[in-house]
Amino acid sequence: MKRLIFTDLDGTFLNHHNYSFEESFEALQKIKAAGVPLIFTTSKTKAEVEYLQEKVGISEPFIVENGAALFIPEGYQGFDLSFLEKYDDKRIMVFGKSYAKVLEFYRRYKERCSMAGLSDMSDEEIVHLTGLNQRDVIHAKQRDFTEPFILKDKTKLEALKKSAHTYELKITKGGRFYHIMSKFQDKGIAVIKTIELFEDLYHERVSSIALGDSENDIAMLEHVDIPIVIKKYDGSYLETNVPHIQKSSYQGSKGWNEMVLKYV
């Protein structure tokens, strides 16, 4: 049976503090040798993921900005993907709203709801908040679908969620930021659509694995055959009611390596 591996990045494939993936080397080599699609499923942007893929040495499909879109390299595994819309050198399936729509809401509510969005932050502020280097900050600001933000007053969260709903938007929580996005998107929907697409392309059922550590990974974990939670940097685990969930013994990329080696 063909397999797909979906993975969150920050705190899962990448270590929380230094963004390293060095401890995942053994599992990565086995994935590459087996030809299993390793699908980064992340809140990061297209530019961020493409740069990371270069460093990792892969060219695979990926899901960006919390399930907003699936990108597939042109001619991936020899498939005819001409039925999908073209986007630069990729094919794309879009599930989210445009960044312009999201920013319209953010700008209307940012002051009354005490939000500080990525689009309003200086590069220096983002470096301080995230630990990213200058190049990665530039990639992070190249957004197409969602707006990450810091909520200065947590008592405003419920009112903000209600307001977002009237715009067909929603608020989710990631590892460092809250995110404004289409209410019709999440990692789970993107994973479902990706599995369906690959089953059509392969003409057979696929087995799916997902690894994550944050609240915005729950929808992804709910829709795969093997859901795996990676231990957080503080030693805790994401709380979820997903059946048959597995937990890593280690944090970050070491925990990712540990769990992937069980199945590849």
Residue ranges and their predicted role:
Residues 16-20:
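Conserved ATPase-coupling elements of RecA-like P-loop NTPase cores
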Residues 21-118:
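Active-site phosphate-binding/coordination module
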